[in-house]
């Protein structure tokens, strides 16, 4: 068995199709009911693709999960013409389809974290994120124009530099005059919550592990669990065990019911925003 052979972390491992595992993964009873209704009842043997269950969970979590900002692979962004020591608030909706849930304040400062994939020194065609000379909107914040980057001795980019346009802040008069294609999420470096995040994926690479004469252990997905340190908006520090959120642009995450502590939650990915296993 996977559990006894230490391929997983016990019967409540979020990758396992057990009730305790599904609960720890952040799956909801409503999502399971939608799954049962979708597949129906049949007396004949049938094989249901795992993506059907994931789709049901996405639909349910999309409706119920408040939105938050998380940077999973952080790269420093420095706004050179933003006053040092200055801070202000930007305002983000808790749920875009539920205005009754209100908005929350997100702190903004001179140094931010952005996703590493959101910068390219030599971008491919059709790349609308940050690169030297290009402008993007920092979601809920300002429009910025990239002016360059810093690298270490190995050539790895360690920081990106930009300038901002003070009259471009989202929600203020005249902000819509700035027409840009890129819209990036970010977290203030001074306020970010450095958090353990567990990126779970399917336990097996094959839809029918061990089929035929194969050893099912050989079908295990070596990338089914990745642990990273992410930079999260500070509001997420107050999350309670089993609180669920959509991390914008990433997917749906749950505060782990076993390892989270007051003021220091640990998050696990329940499901991505779209099916990463889809063919074509």
Regions found by a protein language model. Give the residues of each.
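Short, small-residue-biased leader/transition segments that mark boundaries at the very start
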Residues: 1-3
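Basic, alpha-helical terminal appendages of large translation-related enzymes
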Residues: 9, 15-30, 34, 39-280
